[in-house]
């Protein structure tokens, strides 16, 4: 496998082509952003930690029957992945009220929800990734109802698997967001699963072990990510 030119650079990752048209190299950066890029900073070794956490969690999910774009971890910052066409939606899964949902609905942060909540947002930086519903997504040509049904099914499997896994590590999976990619007629879990994309709270202390520490200037951001890596790597 030969790494080629950079195809795309996002907030947290760079994507490079390879000599195989069906694969890409994903490079994890230390850059940190919040509030749709309004707040910027760096977290030392974040890319290294998120690359490892994502690789381990994607391997776990593959074993549980969730198809992903992940092929293998190449080095401490890079992984080889299938070259998917990203559906321009984020699927957000919420088990406990927190963040924007708690604020939007006037709920106390930490309230256990009576059922898992599934939301979608339109991946569009210019619009600040607005929440939309299924009908919006289909009406403006982003996806189909059949594809959405499959995306929600993938999200539910990911939630069930990760909730159980993190529970065993003494962590509450509060909420998370995922991206889905199209590849040879299939839908695959793509992007990453890490403290950048999940809210993870210590079960016994309630301590936040995720990017909220950066968003809210709570300090000890690197230490929180290291703690998640340590527990995932048990």
From Swiss-Prot:
Q: Which domain of life is it from?
A: Bacteria
| GO molecular-function terms, A-Z | ATP binding; phosphoribosylaminoimidazolesuccinocarboxamide synthase activity
Broadest EC class assigned to this enzyme: ligase
Q: What is its EC number?
A: 6.3.2.6
- Keywords on this record? ATP-binding, Ligase, Nucleotide-binding, Purine biosynthesis
Which reaction(s) does its UniProt entry say it catalyses? 5-amino-1-(5-phospho-D-ribosyl)imidazole-4-carboxylate + L-aspartate + ATP = (2S)-2-[5-amino-1-(5-phospho-beta-D-ribosyl)imidazole-4-carboxamido]succinate + ADP + phosphate + 2 H(+)
- GO biological process entries: 'de novo' IMP biosynthetic process; cobalamin biosynthetic process
Enumerate the HAMAP family for this protein.
SAICAR_synth
Q: Which family does it belong to?
A: Belongs to the SAICAR synthetase family.
| Protein's name according to its UniProt entry | Phosphoribosylaminoimidazole-succinocarboxamide synthase
Q: What is the lineage of its organism?
A: Bacteria, Bacillati, Bacillota, Clostridia, Eubacteriales
């Amino acid at each position: 496998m030969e790494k080629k030119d950079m195809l795309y650079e996002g907030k947290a990752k760079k994507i490079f082509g390879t000599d195989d048209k069906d694969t890409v190299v994903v490079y994890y950066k230390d850059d940190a952003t919040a509030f749709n890029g309004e707040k910027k900073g760096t977290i030392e070794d974040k890319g290294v930690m998120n690359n490892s956490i994502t690789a381990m969690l994607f391997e776990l999910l593959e074993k549980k029957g969730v198809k992903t774009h992940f092929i293998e971890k190449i080095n401490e910052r890079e992984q080889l992945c299938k070259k998917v066409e990203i559906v321009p939606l984020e699927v957000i899964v919420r088990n406990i009220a927190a963040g924007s949902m708690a604020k939007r609905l006037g709920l106390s942060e930490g309230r256990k929800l009576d059922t898992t909540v599934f939301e979608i947002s339109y991946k569009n930086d210019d619009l600040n990734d607005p929440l939309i519903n299924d009908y919006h997504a289909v009406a403006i040509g982003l996806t189909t109802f059949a594809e959405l049904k499959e995306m929600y099914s993938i999200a539910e499997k990911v939630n069930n698997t990760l909730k159980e896994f993190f529970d065993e590590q003494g962590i509450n999976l509060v909420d998370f967001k995922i991206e889905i990619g199209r590849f040879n007629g299939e839908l695959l879990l793509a992007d990453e699963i890490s403290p950048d994309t999940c809210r993870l709270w210590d079960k016994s202390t309630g301590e936040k072990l995720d990017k909220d520490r950066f968003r809210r200037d709570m300090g000890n951001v690197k230490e929180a990510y290291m703690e998640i890596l340590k527990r995932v790597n048990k």
